Amino acid sequence: MNLSKQARERVAKVVKNGAVLIHGNKTVYRNNDANYQFRQFSDFHYLTEWPEPDAHAVILVNDSVPELHMFVLDKNEEMETWDGKRIGQQGAIELYGATKAYSNSQYSDELINLLKGHTEIYCDYSSSVFQEIDQKILNLAVPYDQRGGNFSKANIHSIQPILSELRLIKQSGELELLQKACDISIEGHLAAMKFTKPGDYEYQVAAEMEKTFYHLGAERLGYNSIVAGGDNSCILHYATNREELQDGKLLLIDAAAEYGMYSSDITRTFPINGKYTPEQKAVYLEVLKAQNTGIEMVTTKSTMQEVHKTTIASISESLVDLGLVPQGVEETISMMHYFEFFMHGTGHWLGLDVHDAGSNELDNEPRKFAPGMVTTIEPGIYVRPSKPIIKFPLIDRDPEKLKVRRKEMGMEAATKLEQKEMQEAKTIEHEIPKSLLGIGVRIEDNILCTDSESVNLTEALPRNIEEIENICS
């Protein structure tokens, strides 16, 4: 359990002296006594790698040296007969590096003793255990001091900012697990491409792909698979996966495996019959152009905001060339007309969570990429069939200007003003080329920032049109 040991050591260097309280996930029931597959809370896994529910951890830090105390389910022969083996307290010490381990039923009583002498306490405010137990215990463990100017001896901090910063930079062991998740996901996508044909159903393609994930060692899906044929490719988080695949249409698959708790996140869009139409090819190549530009920018010289801004510019040029917008590139950007066809971000952090921990800003400024960061790059163009004619508002909606105004006026007041301006704005009506309606294309890869250049962890899954057609045919 070397990864969590290293993580605790990194946390201890930040905390220096204090205590960290962190809680694992509970079993979640689907109905009656049938439960969902258990997955550990990512922050708890990061610090302990503990795989069982209903666990707590207290990390005592003295002079930047961490000491792990675990509270876990007891060994219980009867319960293990029903639900499987339990690791128990001895296993927590021998296998997971705990200095001492207790029954989870002892948490409230032992926490008081463990916290004695510690006044810097780091907690997970979002945890129900913090709200139900920790807050009450802290008043007893670190008593109020009304003799001096300070009302309490305890300084309570959120552990989330520390963990988010640490999780943002992947260590070598984490990158190995993430690469394995990517490799498994690639094979699943290839299986789907080879399997797909007109007349199949979306769920059949999903089954073929997910079978490959599990066959190659995935513990679970990174997220619910999106297998979106035809018009469904224009639905960003489509997850019904029940419709029949039509000849001449596209299939957009956004799906990935999770391995060692780390998730990949890949999207490919390919022809159901193995051959792109000229219109599909035109849209696809524009998205690919934008993605290639974005991938090249994942270096220590750029920020996520700069990547997104460049992607918007590329997509906007494409929308003009494809005849999807009524004005030029400058107006398409400044009036946010591109948002009708590209309405999401260009990327997000990737790791233990598919939308992983970490902020795009540092000290209220856009954050530069740093070695060890992993992001997706996933531009798209979605020509929704439900909008053959679009009324575009003729009003400046530059995101940077809106951001400044929101800071000056406050979010609520600025949002109300924006809505009012949109309602009162003049519009220009534009008819969308019929041959493009229902075409949705997204291409998504997983990109590692290094000291020198970006590394595409999912490069082995083809993006080139000829390669894709060869696989699908």
Residue ranges and their predicted role:
Residues 1-473:
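Active-site neighborhoods and metal-handling regions in enzymes and metal-associated proteins
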